Amino acid sequence: MTNMTNRLLALALVAFAAATGACGGDGSSAAGPDEAGGSPQFENPTGAAFQLPPGITLKGKILGGEGGDDGNGGDGCQPGARLGVSPTYVEVCFTIHNSNAEDDTLRLPAGLIFISKNIETQNGTQVREEVVVVPGGRDTTVIWELHCLNAHRDPSTEEDEFTIGPVSDHPGLREVIALVAGKLIDQPAASLIGGAIWEVSDFGGLTDETRDALRALPPASAGAAAARARPALRRQRPDKPTG
């Protein structure tokens, strides 16, 4: 990776940390999205409805978690297939059942939104499609690390529940998804992408600097070698406001 690319990544992450109180609000405010600074479209997301394939059904609740790499979600969630790049501020865990005799494929599209039942907890999304093979006649548990969409809300916890929302049609989020299509998404890239989503959801839209940083991400085909050459940058969870 070039020095210019590293510099863009570093500058973007510093800007995100300085500009946001994201995903760490104290949850005490009942303010509406305009007062809190967020986009109304991420409070009540719009877009195409998501449909599970024939024969595949959701079994039980969609539970929240606190994120991490231990392979386990919240209480009541069995270890399962982990999707996304950890750590994040929104984690969901759900079990699906395939009533078909044959294995089937579940495609979770980029921009699919999971909506928290608690309005003090983040909604979440991801920027790339994930694919899960669901064995015929069996249950499969999925633990998915998601980017947060409401900077003034709290990160998810094991006490949260979610519902499956639409595939977002928000122009800003669709732009982020397009910019990172085919890119290598490791921890530094996920931090950069998370900050880009905050810009879209709560700070008026992407800056040109962020667009340049997203374009500069290496292609997925670069693999582990590119990841080793990248700077060890991580988005830190901001402290909660003290007053």
Predicted segment positions?
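Asparagine-centered strand-capping/turn motif at beta-strand->loop junctions
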Residues: G84, F94-L108
